[in-house]
Amino acid sequence: MLKASLLFFVTALAEIIGCFLPYLWLRKGASMWLLLPAAASLALFVWLLTLHPAASGRVYAAYGGVYVATALIWLRVVDDVKLSLFDWVGAAVALVGMLIIVAGWRVN
């Protein structure tokens, strides 16, 4: 389960970076050249999702929980926004959901 969680975390970072770089270009006036590493990051994201040993729908559902937590870490570290109690509780609920889904992979 730890391996799947770490893979989900790296996958989430690839997706967030792939979306953040175009945001910098569109909203913050950064260089259009950021679209190249953004495309590479999103391609990496898609490839990483294929590495999980479960049906794609289960992978996407479980990944969602880790994505929520990773996005909140990004919010704190990159955007420098203090997380609220609701952020922490929401991340915990999402991660518990992910753990339940991943635990079911062994049953099937």
UniProtKB/Swiss-Prot annotation:
Pfam families, A to Z: UPF0060
Subcellular compartments: Cell inner membrane
Highest taxon of source: Bacteria
UniProt entry tagged with the keyword Cytoplasm: no
Membrane topology, as annotated: Multi-pass membrane protein
Name the UniProt record assigns to this protein: UPF0060 membrane protein YE2027
NCBIfam families for the chain: PRK02237.1 (NF002586)
TM region(s), chain numbering: 6-26, 29-49, 59-79, 85-105
Keywords carried by this UniProt record: Cell inner membrane, Cell membrane, Membrane, Transmembrane, Transmembrane helix
Gene Ontology cellular component annotations, sorted alphabetically: plasma membrane
Family that this chain belongs to: Belongs to the UPF0060 family.
InterPro entries in UniProt: UPF0060 (IPR003844)
